[in-house]
From Swiss-Prot:
InterPro entries on file: AIR_synthase-rel_sll0787, PurM-like_C_dom, PurM-like_C_sf, PurM-like_N, PurM-like_N_sf, ThiL-like, UCP036540_AIR
Species: Synechocystis sp. (strain ATCC 27184 / PCC 6803 / Kazusa)
Highest taxon of the lineage: Bacteria
Protein's recorded name: Uncharacterized protein sll0787
Record GO terms (molecular function): thiamine-phosphate kinase activity
Gene3D superfamilies: PurM-like C-terminal domain, PurM-like, N-terminal domain
Pfam families (UniProt xref): AIRS (PF00586), AIRS_C (PF02769)
Family: To M.jannaschii MJ0640 and MJ0799.
One GO process term, biological-process aspect: thiamine biosynthetic process
Length: 322
């Protein structure tokens, strides 16, 4: 059973498409800004030091298939995924801008409606961008600015840390996008804000060594990216991962969960970190242990097999080098 699951996961596009990022990583692992400060590349956001902590800058593009099948939800997700990037690094969002190309005003309006709904729900204004409704195709990209007092990076997982998976089971698969678990469109702003605020709380109280939001690479793909940038390995116990009722386990492993994070936490802080999320009705489970090396090993029942060797087969190519 584990062998079949590994073969399926290794071939999923959500993971394989992350290798496209190697086009960027081959250009270097850091960039210098005006004052000579080095910005490490490969995190959820670029973290730019300023006098009050860090400015956070990120951008996301929407899959063309999602824009075609569910334009409102594509607009919604374009804001959601950017907001998630900011909170994943311990920050708070300030504003977003967008770049929208569409074949018609009607299509653009549906996308805009989703973006505006998410903007209102997450209290993050859309403050500018680019719009073209005479394009030969539909495309959407959104960028976000945020600020953090303290960071949760994906560069600093430590050997011996426990990897905690955080998720929200109060949702359902989106009808036109079954690998998108929708835990946000029906939730109240106040509830969502309480959930988001837990991440900067962890950062500011130094309760987390590293972290990353769960992306379209799913739980396993996100774990790989975190291990790669931290230059670590891990043993991940699939039996430790709970699944929402009525959802196939393999589907859950590959889903974008709306609200989902992998947090690398020192053993003495695991109980505290889990309690923070569980107090808000969220799921927080220790699913892996950070190991020396460069291998992600999956465990299921009494079976244990190598899933990925990041030294032999890089994923994004970003290794957190400064």
């Amino acid at each position: 059973m584990l062998t079949d699951l590994i073969i399926e996961l290794q071939q999923t596009l959500g993971i394989l498409h992350k290798q496209d990022i190697q086009l960027a990583s081959r250009q270097g692992q850091q960039r210098l800004i005006g004052d000579g400060e080095a910005i490490r590349l490969g995190d959820d956001c670029a973290a730019i030091p300023d006098e009050n902590g860090y400015l956070l800058l990120a951008a996301e593009g929407m899959a063309p298939s999602l824009i075609t099948q569910d334009p409102w939800f594509a607009g919604w997700c374009s804001v959601l995924v950017n907001v998630s990037d900011i909170y994943a690094m311990g920050g708070r969002p300030i504003a977003v801008v967008d770049a929208l190309w569409s074949k018609s005003s009607d299509q653009a309006q549906q996308i805009w409606a989703g973006m505006q709904a998410a903007s209102a729900r997450f209290n993050v204004p859309i403050v500018g961008g680019h719009t073209n409704t005479h394009s030969g195709y539909d495309a959407l990209g959104v960028a976000i600015l945020g600020r953090a007092k303290s960071l949760i990076t994906s560069f600093d997982a430590q050997v011996g840390d426990r990897l905690i998976l955080v998720s929200n089971f109060q949702g359902k698969p989106r009808p036109n996008a079954p690998y998108c678990w929708d835990a946000a469109t029906m939730a109240e702003t106040e509830t969502l804000q309480k959930h988001w605020d837990l991440l900067p709380y962890l950062a500011e109280n130094k309760l987390c060594d590293a972290g990353k939001d769960v992306s379209m690479g799913g739980i396993i793909g996100t774990a790989l990216m975190l291990l790669e940038t931290s230059k670590c390995g891990a043993i991940l116990d699939l039996d430790a991962i709970s699944c929402p009722a009525g959802l196939d386990f393999r589907q859950w492993l590959l889903s974008f969960p709306s609200y989902g994070f992998l947090l690398s936490v020192r053993p003495q802080f695991v109980k505290t970190v889990k309690a923070c999320f569980q107090a808000e009705g969220l799921i927080a489970e220790a699913i892996a242990t950070i190991q020396p090396g460069h291998n992600l090993t999956l465990k299921l029942g009494s079976e244990s097999q190598l899933f990925w060797d990041l030294q032999q087969n890089p994923l994004t190519g970003f290794t957190g080098d400064s």
